[in-house]
Amino acid sequence: MRKLVLTTLARENLKDVFEFIESEFGINSRIKFANKVNKSLNLIVINPELFPKSELNVRIHKCVITKQSTLYYTYTIKEIKVLSVFDTRQKPSKIKKFI
């Protein structure tokens, strides 16, 4: 089984999204989002090819967690590296600097 690695940027992105969701919608919404993230990560670990490749870079896959958040990752035989969790409400061109 591949090792799951979150980059520093991905950790910061998740922290920011968790804090935003909790402040705007409450702890229950934060927990629901965390469960969706965990479910998505489990699916990626089982089958990293499950999600489509990014239009910006064919070596990077994207997993839509919710319509407001997308997780970007790469993988090798040994590991899955989560690069970023992008808030899709941002200007779309901003993702280019993250992946």
Task: Describe the predicted segments one by one.
Residues 13, 40-43, 62, 84:
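Residue-level recognition of specific faces of alpha-helices
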Residues 32, 57, 93-96:
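Solvent-exposed interaction patches of small proteins and small membrane subunits
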Residues 1-34:
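Arg/Lys-rich, positively charged N-terminal/basic patches that mediate binding to nucleic acids
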Residues 38-39, 46, 50-79:
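Basic/aromatic recognition patch in beta-strand/loop cores that engages polyanionic ligands
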Residues 9-17, 51, 68-70, 92-94:
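Conserved N-terminal glycine/acidic-rich loop preference
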Residues 69-70, 74-99:
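Enriched for short, Lys/Arg-rich terminal
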Residues 23, 43-46:
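Conserved amphipathic alpha-helical interaction elements at protein-protein interfaces in regulatory
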